[in-house]
């Protein structure tokens, strides 16, 4: 197959958080992007809610952070926050993991310029679509991939418009598979997965009801329910009086999704919030499986996996969607570097090496949290919890693209005491640049960065000629001078 002039640089299949983030970050770097999504629109359900500080740093690079914060800033809009294991909402507390927002974020506040946010997926996705399109990405909903052929020169794909039935062919240098946990693209390539597999089965219910007597106004939280009659979770959404309720099911005992009628779900919700007379408005009921998988390969020629297509993460800890966005950022800058001629194809191999390490940390952390809060029988058989700060901000990349030191095998560090060693995230330090106070973290994201001490001379403000290895590339370098803090009084 010879693709002399592909229709697009990158074809992204799947319009969830991972796919849309990939499209946005690629388009901002000038790549020609086409994203197709078989659903008719962005998510109509809250799904993954919450953005950790690393995700907000990436959203700052993508130019969408302010809109996400305006959509739902947990500090300003949500009031207090709690995470507890309870028999029922408002009932006996079996264990408390966070009594306040300050307790929840205290371990990360000094490590990052960005706050946590609690925007739900159905609010985030339209923002990503709008900004990706603004930068030139083409987004096609109600369009599915029916087949593709991959070769050394790229990909040829067949697409079907689900509204009209019309089929078309598109050629691309690269294909990003963001088509979810049951990824047809991954399976067609014969890419296997490893992990704990299916952990539990749930029915997810979205409903509306006035629960101010149970959850006071100005307070929000996530409750893990250990009711005598069932196990589940209860949580808020960003809309007044709208809530989520998940109840564990037992298909091995013959239970079926259709057994969970609106009437039965109403009875369970009444038990969960201890309100026998409550009449909730049931908006949606869906079956859902909790699982933990990681793909054995993240790249096959011109095809790269992103998000749930590459790994499936238990939702405990709220890191699955955040990790998908991180995948999108990492694969996008590497694809853009190759497309621009700044790097060779081997750079793409580092994507899977780096992101699979992060995914292992995230899956292990999520499993540890799941065992603590919902499945104590798993304690001792899953890794111990490292802590959100280390997993979110203290992870380390190891790959052929990182000139890493091999003197420390640990995959994380405490971001409150950053080492600055290769492979770790850039430490957060407040600096003054052109009269503006900003974080060192904000210097990264769009181009190569050189940090120079005051004795760096002519470097700050006048980027040097690229080293010889980049001589043939159109490479942009940002530089900044670092001054020591003033002496203490």
UniProtKB/Swiss-Prot annotation:
Keywords: Antibiotic biosynthesis, FAD, Flavoprotein, NAD, NADP, Nucleotide-binding, Oxidoreductase. One of its GO terms (biological process) is antibiotic biosynthetic process. The active site is at residue 224. It catalyses: aklavinone + NADPH + O2 + H(+) = epsilon-rhodomycinone + NADP(+) + H2O. GO terms for molecular function: FAD binding; oxidoreductase activity, acting on paired donors, with incorporation or reduction of molecular oxygen, NAD(P)H as one donor, and incorporation of one atom of oxygen. Pfam families: FAD_binding_3. It comes from the Bacteria. FAD binds at residues 17-18, 37, 121, 145, 308. Its EC number is 1.14.13.180. Belongs to the PheA/TfdB FAD monooxygenase family. Involved in the biosynthesis of the anthracyclines carminomycin, rhodomycin and daunorubicin (daunomycin) which are aromatic polyketide antibiotics that exhibit high cytotoxicity and are widely applied in the chemotherapy of a variety of cancers. It can also hydroxylate 11-deoxycarminomycinone and can use both NAD or NADP. This is Aklavinone 12-hydroxylase DnrF. The gene is dnrF.
């Amino acid at each position: 197959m010879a693709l002399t002039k592909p229709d697009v640089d990158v074809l992204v299949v799947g319009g969830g958080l991972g796919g849309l983030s990939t499209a946005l970050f690629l388009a901002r770097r000038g790549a020609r992007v086409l994203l197709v999504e078989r659903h008719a629109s962005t998510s109509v359900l809250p799904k993954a809610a919450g953005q950790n500080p690393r995700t907000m740093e990436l959203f700052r690079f993508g130019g969408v952070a302010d809109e996400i914060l305006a959509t739902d800033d947990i500090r300003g809009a949500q009031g207090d926050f709690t995470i507890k294991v309870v028999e029922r909402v408002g009932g006996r507390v079996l264990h408390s993991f966070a009594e306040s927002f300050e307790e929840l974020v205290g371990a990360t506040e000094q490590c990052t310029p960005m706050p946590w946010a609690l925007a739900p997926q159905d609010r985030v996705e339209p923002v990503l679509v709008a900004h990706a399109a603004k930068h030139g990405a083409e987004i096609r909903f109600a369009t599915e991939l029916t087949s593709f052929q991959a070769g050394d020169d790229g990909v040829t794909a067949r697409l079907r418009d689900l509204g009209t039935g019309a089929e078309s062919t598109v050629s691309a240098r690269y294909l990003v598979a963001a088509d979810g946990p049951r990824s047809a693209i991954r399976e067609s390539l014969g890419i296997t997965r490893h992990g704990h597999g299916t952990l539990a089965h749930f029915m997810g219910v979205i409903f509306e009801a006035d629960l101010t007597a149970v959850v006071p106004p100005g307070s929000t939280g996530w409750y893990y329910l250990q009711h005598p009659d069932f196990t589940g979770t209860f949580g808020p959404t960003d809309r007044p009086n709208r809530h989520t309720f998940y109840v564990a099911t037992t298909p091995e005992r013959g239970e079926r999704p259709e057994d969970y009628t609106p009437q039965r779900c109403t009875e369970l919700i009444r038990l969960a919030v201890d309100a026998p007379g409550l009449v909730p408005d049931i908006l949606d009921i869906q079956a859902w499986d909790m699982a933990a998988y990681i793909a054995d390969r993240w790249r096959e020629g011109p095809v790269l996996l992103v998000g749930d297509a590459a790994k499936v993460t238990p939702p405990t800890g709220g890191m699955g969607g955040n990790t998908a966005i991180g995948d999108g950022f990492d694969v996008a800058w590497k694809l853009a570097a190759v497309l621009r001629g700044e790097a060779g194809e081997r750079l793409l191999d580092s994507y899977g090496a780096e992101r699979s390490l992060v995914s292992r940390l995230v899956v292990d952390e999520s499993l540890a949290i799941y065992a603590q809060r919902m499945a104590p029988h798993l304690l001792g058989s899953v890794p111990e919890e490292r802590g959100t700060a280390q997993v979110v901000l203290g992870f380390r990349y190891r790959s052929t693209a990182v000139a890493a030191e091999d003197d420390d095998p640990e995959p994380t560090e405490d971001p409150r005491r950053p080492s600055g060693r290769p492979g770790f995230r850039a430490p957060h330090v407040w600096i003054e640049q052109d009269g503006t106070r900003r974080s060192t973290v904000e210097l990264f994201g769009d181009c190569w960065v050189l940090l120079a001490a005051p004795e760096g001379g002519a470097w700050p403000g006048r980027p040097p000629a690229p080293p010889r290895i980049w001589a043939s590339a159109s490479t942009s370098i940002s530089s900044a001078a670092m001054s020591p803090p003033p002496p203490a009084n």
